[in-house]
Amino acid sequence: MIESKQELYEYLEMDKKALGIKRKFPRPFIDEIWKYEILMLKLAYLINCKDNFMYKPITLITRLRYEKLGMKLGFSIGINSFGPGLNIAHYGTIVVNGNARIGSNCWIYPGANIGANTGGPKDVPNIGDNVYIGPGAKLFGNINIADNISIGANAVVTKSFTTSGITIAGVPAKIIKDNNPNGKLMMQRINNN
């Protein structure tokens, strides 16, 4: 959760590194995912830090731009859900409940759905740092996912996995490897930028 302008700048820089971008500004009509992440972080900053009458018009305009670009790209991601270092790999449907909490350095692919179970809006996943969420993965309910986990394509995760550094996949999800091959790739991308 962004609580200062300094944190906003740190989040922006880490997201840029996670996306593998070295440019200073997004290119028009090309860097749409990066623009979406920038708007998401700016909106979180405005909501968390500038919640007064003077900033309401700026917050409203930023929210409208964020929602419009999200519809164009197919993203429905709640504000304050992700930590720094988010990498949205491609355009496509991605749905993340606004109450879900995902740690830093998350890679998420199209078709992913992180949502509430029938228990209510607070019955949502809590996901650790350095997690890879593969295409079409579904995570539901009050579950905890440890750090350094890869979630395979089309996995349906309905129970907690508290062992760090594993790969899970399947319907329902189960451990298929005792290591996380995507973790090294994620760290190389972040450290090389």
Q: Which residue ranges define each predicted feature?
A:
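Extended, non-globular alpha-helical segments
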Residues: 58-60, 74, 105-107, 118
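Short N-terminal helix-initiation segments at or just after the protein's N-terminus
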Residues: 26-31, 73-79, 112-120
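Terminal amphipathic alpha-helical/low-complexity segments used for targeting or macromolecular assembly
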Residues: 1-73, 181-193
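Left-handed beta-helix
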Residues: 79, 84-85, 89-98, 103-104, ...
